[in-house]
Swiss-Prot record:
GO terms for cellular component: cytoplasm. Belongs to the RNA methyltransferase RlmH family. It is found in: Cytoplasm. Its EC number is 2.1.1.177. One of its GO terms (molecular function) is rRNA (pseudouridine-N3-)-methyltransferase activity. This is Putative ribosomal RNA large subunit methyltransferase H. It catalyses: pseudouridine(1915) in 23S rRNA + S-adenosyl-L-methionine = N(3)-methylpseudouridine(1915) in 23S rRNA + S-adenosyl-L-homocysteine + H(+). Keywords: Cytoplasm, Methyltransferase, rRNA processing, S-adenosyl-L-methionine, Transferase. Specifically methylates the pseudouridine at position 1915 (m3Psi1915) in 23S rRNA. The lineage of its organism: Archaea, Methanobacteriati, Methanobacteriota, Methanomada group, Methanococci. It holds the Pfam family SPOUT_MTase. Its main location: cytoplasm. HAMAP family: 23SrRNA_methyltr_H. It comes from Methanococcus maripaludis (strain C7 / ATCC BAA-1331). S-adenosyl-L-methionine binds at L76, G108, F127, S128, K129, M130, T131, F132.
């Protein structure tokens, strides 16, 4: 299994970097894990719809450069499907059993993801209807991927 996380924006806070490194290390027992950061665009204070669209398209171009043709794409979107931890584990396990050994998760920047990226997504996943900072979302996603592997392998995990 190969897990790739493509995320818009850099992690600036040490405590988030530490958490990302810790969960990446834990996941590496079960799967190869790659985290790719693409640059985010500077967003003006009150961007117009045209400015938002241009920003999202520039970020989408950067994301597209890293997509593998045969990877199963899961985008993180507010309007995606909400899953329990057990359901996410089942989804990852089912993909693995069906021969999809490459899964790519995509986390957008402060404005989310462009329609172009959303349209090519194989599965739209929502963690909540609430908005989270994309840097924190990376930690939350990694924790849930780690938890999924623990569930898949019948290992105990914190409830």
């Amino acid at each position: 299994m190969n897990i790739t996380i493509i995320s818009v924006g850099k992690i600036k806070e040490k405590y988030l970097s530490d958490a990302i490194n810790e969960y990446s290390k834990r996941i590496s027992r079960y799967s190869k894990i790659d985290i790719i950061e693409v640059a985010d665009e500077k967003t003006p204070e009150n961007p117009s719809e045209v400015e938002k669209s241009k920003i999202l398209e520039k970020e989408a171009e950067r994301i597209l450069k890293y997509l593998k043709k045969d990877s199963f794409l899961i985008t993180l979107e507010i309007l995606g499907k909400e899953l329990t931890s057990e359901s996410l584990a089942k989804k990852i396990n089912d993909l693995s059993i069906s021969g999809k050994s490459d899964i790519t998760f995509i986390i957008g920047g402060s404005l989310g993801l462009s329609k172009n990226i959303s349209e090519i997504s194989d599965f739209k996943l929502s963690f909540s209807k609430m908005t989270f900072p994309h840097q924190l979302m990376r930690v939350i996603l990694l924790e849930q991927v780690y938890r999924s592997f623990r569930i898949i392998n019948g290992e105990p995990y914190h409830k």
